[in-house]
Protein backbone atom coordinates (compact mmCIF):
# COMPACT_ATOMS: atom_id res chain seq x y z
CA UNK A 1 0.00 0.00 0.00
CA UNK A 2 1.39 3.41 -0.95
CA UNK A 3 0.18 6.53 0.82
CA UNK A 4 1.16 10.16 0.22
CA UNK A 5 -0.08 12.49 2.97
CA UNK A 6 -0.43 15.41 2.39
CA UNK A 7 -1.34 14.11 -1.02
CA UNK A 8 -0.18 15.21 -4.43
CA UNK A 9 -2.33 16.34 -6.29
CA UNK A 10 -5.24 16.85 -3.88
CA UNK A 11 -3.52 18.29 -0.81
CA UNK A 12 -5.75 16.11 1.38
CA UNK A 13 -4.36 14.35 4.43
CA UNK A 14 -5.11 11.14 6.22
CA UNK A 15 -5.93 11.54 9.90
CA UNK A 16 -4.55 9.42 12.70
CA UNK A 17 -7.85 7.50 12.70
CA UNK A 18 -7.53 6.88 8.94
CA UNK A 19 -4.09 5.39 9.53
CA UNK A 20 -5.33 3.28 12.44
CA UNK A 21 -8.08 1.92 10.18
CA UNK A 22 -5.52 1.21 7.47
CA UNK A 23 -3.45 -0.64 10.08
CA UNK A 24 -6.12 -3.34 10.25
CA UNK A 25 -5.72 -4.08 6.56
CA UNK A 26 -1.92 -4.01 6.71
CA UNK A 27 -2.09 -6.63 9.47
CA UNK A 28 -4.80 -8.69 7.76
CA UNK A 29 -2.97 -8.95 4.45
CA UNK A 30 0.54 -8.95 5.96
CA UNK A 31 1.76 -6.33 3.50
CA UNK A 32 3.97 -3.26 3.62
CA UNK A 33 2.87 0.34 3.83
CA UNK A 34 5.02 2.85 1.96
CA UNK A 35 4.38 6.27 3.46
CA UNK A 36 5.55 9.19 1.33
CA UNK A 37 5.80 12.10 3.78
CA UNK A 38 7.66 14.65 1.63
CA UNK A 39 5.05 17.35 2.39
CA UNK A 40 4.82 16.69 6.16
CA UNK A 41 6.09 20.17 7.09
CA UNK A 42 3.65 21.90 4.72
CA UNK A 43 0.51 21.40 6.80
CA UNK A 44 -2.06 24.13 7.29
CA UNK A 45 -5.45 22.43 7.51
CA UNK A 46 -7.25 21.13 10.56
CA UNK A 47 -5.55 17.72 10.42
CA UNK A 48 -2.18 17.21 12.09
CA UNK A 49 0.43 15.25 10.17
CA UNK A 50 0.68 11.70 11.47
CA UNK A 51 3.35 9.20 10.54
CA UNK A 52 2.18 5.57 10.37
CA UNK A 53 5.73 4.49 11.25
CA UNK A 54 4.84 5.43 14.82
CA UNK A 55 2.12 2.77 15.07
CA UNK A 56 3.68 -0.01 17.15
CA UNK A 57 1.85 -3.01 15.71
CA UNK A 58 2.84 -2.25 12.08
CA UNK A 59 6.10 -0.32 12.40
CA UNK A 60 7.96 -3.41 11.16
CA UNK A 61 5.95 -3.13 7.92
CA UNK A 62 6.19 0.61 7.30
CA UNK A 63 8.63 2.18 4.87
CA UNK A 64 8.72 5.94 5.37
CA UNK A 65 10.20 8.03 2.59
CA UNK A 66 10.86 11.71 3.01
CA UNK A 67 13.20 14.48 1.97
CA UNK A 68 14.21 18.06 2.49
CA UNK A 69 13.47 19.77 -0.81
CA UNK A 70 9.86 20.72 -0.08
CA UNK A 71 10.23 21.89 3.54
CA UNK A 72 13.35 23.91 2.76
CA UNK A 73 11.98 25.31 -0.53
CA UNK A 74 14.64 23.44 -2.50
CA UNK A 75 12.28 21.86 -4.98
CA UNK A 76 14.27 20.04 -7.62
CA UNK A 77 17.15 19.38 -5.27
CA UNK A 78 16.79 15.64 -4.86
CA UNK A 79 17.89 14.70 -1.37
CA UNK A 80 15.93 12.42 0.85
CA UNK A 81 15.91 9.51 3.21
CA UNK A 82 13.91 6.51 4.25
CA UNK A 83 13.16 4.79 7.52
CA UNK A 84 12.33 1.10 7.33
CA UNK A 85 13.02 -2.25 8.96
CA UNK A 86 16.67 -3.25 8.58
CA UNK A 87 15.93 -6.14 6.21
CA UNK A 88 14.10 -3.76 3.87
CA UNK A 89 16.88 -1.17 4.04
CA UNK A 90 19.45 -3.80 3.04
CA UNK A 91 17.43 -4.74 -0.04
CA UNK A 92 16.83 -1.10 -0.98
CA UNK A 93 20.56 -0.34 -0.72
CA UNK A 94 21.28 -3.13 -3.20
CA UNK A 95 18.81 -1.60 -5.64
CA UNK A 96 19.70 2.05 -5.00
CA UNK A 97 23.44 1.61 -5.48
CA UNK A 98 22.81 0.73 -9.12
CA UNK A 99 20.43 3.62 -9.78
CA UNK A 100 22.40 6.57 -8.45
CA UNK A 101 25.60 7.07 -6.56
CA UNK A 102 25.31 10.18 -4.44
CA UNK A 103 23.78 13.57 -4.01
CA UNK A 104 25.89 16.40 -5.38
CA UNK A 105 27.88 18.41 -2.86
CA UNK A 106 26.10 21.75 -3.25
CA UNK A 107 22.76 20.13 -2.40
CA UNK A 108 24.22 18.44 0.68
CA UNK A 109 25.72 21.77 1.79
CA UNK A 110 22.42 23.56 1.14
CA UNK A 111 20.47 21.14 3.32
CA UNK A 112 23.14 21.37 6.03
CA UNK A 113 22.83 25.17 6.02
CA UNK A 114 19.03 24.92 6.11
CA UNK A 115 19.22 22.76 9.24
CA UNK A 116 21.40 25.39 10.92
CA UNK A 117 18.79 28.13 10.45
CA UNK A 118 16.48 28.17 13.46
CA UNK A 119 13.50 29.74 11.69
CA UNK A 120 13.95 29.27 7.99
CA UNK A 121 10.64 30.71 6.90
CA UNK A 122 8.47 27.60 7.05
CA UNK A 123 5.81 29.31 9.17
CA UNK A 124 5.57 32.20 6.72
CA UNK A 125 5.60 29.82 3.77
CA UNK A 126 2.68 27.85 5.23
CA UNK A 127 0.84 31.11 5.89
CA UNK A 128 1.33 32.08 2.24
CA UNK A 129 -0.07 28.71 1.18
CA UNK A 130 -3.18 29.37 3.29
CA UNK A 131 -3.55 32.78 1.61
CA UNK A 132 -3.35 31.10 -1.80
CA UNK A 133 -5.89 28.45 -0.82
CA UNK A 134 -8.28 31.15 0.43
CA UNK A 135 -7.83 33.06 -2.82
CA UNK A 136 -8.47 29.95 -4.91
CA UNK A 137 -11.55 29.04 -2.87
CA UNK A 138 -12.90 32.55 -3.43
CA UNK A 139 -12.26 32.41 -7.19
CA UNK A 140 -13.60 28.89 -7.71
CA UNK A 141 -16.67 29.45 -5.54
CA UNK A 142 -17.79 32.00 -8.17
CA UNK A 143 -17.41 29.51 -11.02
CA UNK A 144 -20.57 27.37 -11.25
CA UNK A 145 -18.89 24.65 -13.33
CA UNK A 146 -15.85 24.26 -11.12
CA UNK A 147 -15.55 22.76 -7.68
CA UNK A 148 -12.53 22.92 -5.48
CA UNK A 149 -11.29 20.47 -2.89
CA UNK A 150 -9.69 22.54 -0.14
CA UNK A 151 -6.27 21.06 0.72
CA UNK A 152 -4.97 20.30 4.22
CA UNK A 153 -1.33 20.63 3.26
CA UNK A 154 1.26 20.30 0.55
CA UNK A 155 1.62 22.58 -2.43
CA UNK A 156 -1.15 21.19 -4.60
CA UNK A 157 -4.91 21.38 -4.85
CA UNK A 158 -7.44 19.70 -7.04
CA UNK A 159 -10.07 21.42 -9.16
CA UNK A 160 -12.96 19.35 -10.47
CA UNK A 161 -13.71 20.40 -14.06
CA UNK A 162 -16.13 17.58 -14.87
CA UNK A 163 -19.10 19.98 -15.19
CA UNK A 164 -17.33 21.87 -17.98
CA UNK A 165 -17.56 18.89 -20.30
CA UNK A 166 -13.81 18.92 -20.95
Label the predicted regions.
Residues 1-166:
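PLP-dependent class I/II
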Amino acid sequence: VIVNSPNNPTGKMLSKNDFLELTKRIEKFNCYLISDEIYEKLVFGSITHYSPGSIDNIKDRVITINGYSKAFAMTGWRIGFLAAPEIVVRKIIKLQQHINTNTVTFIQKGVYKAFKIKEYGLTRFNESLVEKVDYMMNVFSKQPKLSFLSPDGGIFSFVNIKSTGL
